[in-house]
Regions:
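P-loop NTP-binding module
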Residues: 1-168
């Protein structure tokens, strides 16, 4: 397997994962639950400084680990330049997503954009159609409304974002 191909392979918590790997995510989950209990912080943004540091892998595994404890978890892919979540989880590129729900065309279709992974215990809101202005789209009222709607349904919202060095 080539280096480039190997880079995009997802290593997930579960029965096949090494004990230490799974325990590290359980420890992270416990720490976040303690923090959430005192601050009511239920939206967790995952980022990195540069591409290739594993932020999408962390986002997926954190979402699964939180769901394993009985929490309702939605994983939102906001990496609109280079979506890795959809590739990891084999969500078709043409599936509607957050961009479609906030740009006006399919705003009422949030429920249709969500992809339920019952085997993993999580729901994913993929990117959708890649917009010409991704960073501007993240700061809209429609985005705020979408997150408000998700907060009504889910215990945790895990947000996968682009690396800090990529966003302009």
């Amino acid at each position: 397997m080539s280096k480039k191909r190997e880079h995009h392979k997802l290593f997930m918590v579960g029965s096949d994962a090494p004990f230490q790997f799974t325990e590290a995510y359980k420890s992270l989950r416990t720490n976040l639950e303690f923090l959430a209990a005192t601050s009511d912080c239920k939206t967790i943004l995952i980022t990195s400084s540069v591409p290739g540091e594993g932020k999408s892998n962390v986002a997926v595994n954190l979402a699964i680990t939180l769901a394993d404890s009985g929490k309702r978890v939605v994983l939102v892919d906001c990496d609109m330049r280079k979506s890795t979540i959809s590739r990891y989880l084999h969500i078709p590129r043409d599936h509607i997503g957050i961009t479609n729900t906030i740009t006006g065309k399919d705003r009422t279709q949030l429920a249709n954009a969500l992809v339920n992974f019952k085997d993993l215990g999580i729901v994913v809101l993929p990117v959708g159609t890649i917009p010409p202005n991704p960073s501007e789209l993240l700061a809209t009222k429609a985005m705020e409304s979408t997150f408000a709607a998700l907060k009504q349904v889910y215990d945790y919202i895990i947000v996968d974002t682009p690396p800090g060095s990529v966003v302009t």
